[in-house]
Amino acid sequence: MPKSYFITGIGTEVGKTVVSAIVAEALKADYWKPIQAGDLENSDSHKVKKLVSNKDSVFFKNACALNTPMSPHAAAEIDGIKLQIKNIKRPETEKDLVIEGAGGLMVPLNAKEVIADLISKEDLVILVSRHYLGSINHTLLSIEALKSRGIDKIGIIFSGDEHPTTEAAIKKLGKVKVVGRIEEEPYFDEMVVKEYAEKFRKRLCEI
């Protein structure tokens, strides 16, 4: 039965797009970013498509493409768009689906809804945690936010140079499966993504 993998992060610019490409490549899954705010000519969907080398993945259009690189609720207001989850329909596919969120879990979509509300309890969530001072707190808070919503199928991918004490603390206190860690690579291309895809495939299937 097809699965949905929701890729989120402990903040912005932590590596969600690269992770989305790796997961899509590993599982030959389809890809969808519901909301894109800004950079429409070089969107995350474009970036993922360039990084995925398998010929099976389908790349679905954004449900909502906003012009301003801001939090979705603010970007939607500038564009005069009423952004509501009830109007965001998941694409139909018979394959696994990778869904990339925008920013972190509590990024607002409107006055009542946040990114986390896009996640189904059946989704497998990949939380991307980049190492920096304060990342343990941000990671554990993100895990707590997911679990408080009844979302407990969570895997974590660390991003950046190895930090054993940080990773050990998150693993012990967060009680989530660690899929792996992405090194501070000089660049990402199809070959680098494919290497990580092969490395992470087994653990992705175990979440």
UniProtKB/Swiss-Prot annotation:
Q: In which pathway does it act?
A: Cofactor biosynthesis; biotin biosynthesis; biotin from 7,8-diaminononanoate: step 1/2
CDD domains recorded for this chain?
DTBS
Q: Which reaction does it catalyse?
A: (7R,8S)-7,8-diammoniononanoate + CO2 + ATP = (4R,5S)-dethiobiotin + ADP + phosphate + 3 H(+)
The active site of this protein is located at K33
* GO CC aspect terms: cytosol
Q: What class of enzyme is it?
A: ligase
Question: What cofactor is this protein dependent on?
Answer: Mg(2+)
List of residues binding ATP: E13, V14, G15, K16, T17, V18, D44, E100, G101, A102, G103
Q: Which Pfam families match?
A: AAA_26
Key words, A-Z? ATP-binding, Biotin biosynthesis, Cytoplasm, Ligase, Magnesium, Metal-binding, Nucleotide-binding
- Domain of life where this protein originates: Bacteria
EC identifiers of the protein: 6.3.3.3
Q: Name one GO molecular function term.
A: ATP binding
Cystine links in this protein are none
Question: What InterPro entries does the annotation carry?
Answer: DTB_synth_BioD, P-loop_NTPase
Tell me its family: Belongs to the dethiobiotin synthetase family.
Summarizing the function annotation, the protein's role is: Catalyzes a mechanistically unusual reaction, the ATP-dependent insertion of CO2 between the N7 and N8 nitrogen atoms of 7,8-diaminopelargonic acid (DAPA, also called 7,8-diammoniononanoate) to form a ureido ring.
Q: What is this protein called?
A: ATP-dependent dethiobiotin synthetase BioD
Q: What is the organism field in this record?
A: Christiangramia forsetii (strain DSM 17595 / CGMCC 1.15422 / KT0803)
Q: Which gene encodes it?
A: bioD
